[in-house]
Regions:
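Terminal targeting segments of Actinobacterial cell-envelope proteins
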Residues: 1-12
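Hydrophobic alpha-helical transmembrane segments in integral membrane proteins
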Residues: 89-106
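Membrane-interface helix-boundary signature
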Residues: 10-18, 71-74
Length: 481
């Protein structure tokens, strides 16, 4: 083979390699651009268009060099380098999308379980040994019937039900020896635990069935203002578990005026409970046992607004975010010692890490205004977190923050909406002005509870003038006033 033919053969090989490299580059870069535009990534200051232009420029230069058989070694270097950059970028974007999507993964359903329970020392070990159970069919009949149908199907056992007024009443009957077995819905267990902290050691579950409940799709907002329901639970198990909501904050956001209003509704507020609560009055925290939809609809009815999205968080693990942010600073207006952690908080500005923050937001018994003061402290910590999260520095660490909290937070806000908010903040800069308010009322012990009809519970009867003032403030922010 002559030198000319060798050069010709080498040139054909290099062109073939370059064509293959160009095809790989176009495939990777095309998929990368698809994700960038689909999820609105880099959609500020035209960075997504700049990225597109760079991709097309590299592709065009590579194509022209191949066609005109110029600088073949440089072409190989250019395409290999571009493939590496595209691969790394694509991996980062896919990781980011995957992490964020996990926050949405369980947003369309909630989980709970229903069990048949007997006394811990009972000789009964299987539901086939039973002929009847005690359960509150008047307040939770649908779930009870689901369990009975499952037992009949899987265990070939048909159980009759002795009526009780509530799950708490059923538990009392079991402990008193008036019944051999009860049905127990997991979402009501913390209600029993509030009166009988050692209840779990007194019983054993001989049959358990898990269920899921569909959650309503988000009411997507195309306006510059919207409402987010922030629900704080403090429970074991997955974030998708149904549980009482001890923190109930309505976050009203106006992107035009850069205002955020946090409205705290005390957990003991006496309100008509929507959905599973049959619009019967009870304390707000009990709405959570019927699912997050019930809490949302209850607050929508109370304040006369639409709630577009929700964020549900396990408060204990969520506060770990504070350590990622380097702690937060809040103003404490009364000296107190928290039961959790025995932390002492003086009057004035205090710097909190995650453990101190947990003690700060949990305490209510040492505070002058009890649960309302606790709600105000929760607001202070959330405001402090929001102020750090909306800083440019925090947005740069967005992926790290989400990665650490994916098992602690559940939200139905789509990734595209999240990215629109991030892009708008990066585009405009500045900080949001955050204000807060709380619904006020009078404490009473004589109001009936739909979920716990046999108990005398502390309730907060809502003050009508306070409700009117709170509703007006929410509307002002929504309307940009």
């Amino acid at each position: 083979m002559t030198k000319r033919s060798k050069r010709s053969h080498s040139g054909r090989v290099k062109r073939s390699v370059n064509i293959a490299l160009l095809a790989v580059y176009l495939l990777l870069a095309g998929f990368l651009l698809f994700l960038i535009f689909k999820y609105h990534i880099l959609a500020f200051r035209y960075l997504n268009l700049v990225a597109t232009a760079l991709v097309l420029l590299v592709a065009l230069v590579g194509l022209l060099l191949i066609i005109y058989k110029k600088a073949e070694k440089f072409t190989i270097f250019l395409l290999v380098f571009s493939i590496l950059v595209s691969s790394v970028s694509l991996f980062a974007v896919q990781q980011f999308v995957g992490l964020t999507n996990r926050l949405n993964a369980t947003s369309n359903y909630s989980e709970y379980s229903i069990s048949v329970a007997v006394l811990a020392d009972s000789e009964i070990g299987n539901v086939t040994q039973l002929t009847s159970v005690t359960a509150p069919t008047g307040t939770d009949n649908e779930n009870i019937q689901k369990l009975l149908a499952d037992i009949k199907s899987s265990q070939n056992t048909d159980l009759t039900v002795n009526q009780s007024s509530s799950y708490l009443a059923a538990y009392k009957s079991l402990i008193a020896g008036d019944t051999k077995a009860i049905i127990l819905n997991s979402v009501f267990e913390n209600i029993i635990e509030s009166e009988y902290p050692d209840y779990a050691s007194k019983i054993k579950k001989i049959y358990t069935k898990g269920f899921t409940k569909k959650v309503e799709a988000p009411k997507t907002s195309k306006n510059q203002s919207f409402n987010i329901y922030v629900s704080g639970i403090d429970t074991y198990g997955p974030i998708s578990s149904v549980s009482r909501s001890d923190v109930n904050i309505l976050m009203t956001v106006n992107r035009d005026t850069k205002k955020i209003l946090l409205t705290t509704t005390p957990r003991d507020a006496y309100v008509p409970i929507a959905d599973g609560g049959n619009n019967q009055k009870d304390k707000l925290t009990h709405a959570g046992i019927y699912g997050v939809d019930s809490s949302i609809h209850t607050l929508e009815n109370l304040y006369g607004v639409d709630i577009n999205y929700y964020v549900r968080l396990n408060f204990t693990s969520f506060l770990k975010l504070i350590d990622l942010l380097g702690g937060v600073d809040v103003y404490n207006d009364q000296e107190f010692t928290a039961l959790h952690g025995k932390f002492q908080f003086p009057v004035g500005n205090v710097h909190l890490d995650s453990e101190q923050a947990l003690g700060f937001v949990r305490e209510r018994y040492s505070l002058a205004d009890g649960d309302r003061d606790r709600g105000r402290n929760q607001q202070k910590v959330i405001v402090a977190i929001l102020q750090k999260l909306t800083s440019t520095e925090a947005l740069k660490n967005y992926s790290t923050i989400i990665d650490s909290l994916q098992d602690s937070i559940q939200t139905n806000m789509p990734l595209e909406t999240m990215m629109n908010l991030v892009n708008a903040q990066l585009e405009s800069g500045g900080t949001y002005k955050v204000n807060s308010q709380d619904l006020k009322g009078t404490g009473r012990m004589d109001l009936p509870s739909y979920a716990m009809p046999d108990s005398n519970l502390y309730m907060m009867e809502i003050d009508d003038s306070s409700l009117a003032s709170v509703k007006a403030a929410i509307q002002d922010v929504l309307e940009g006033k």
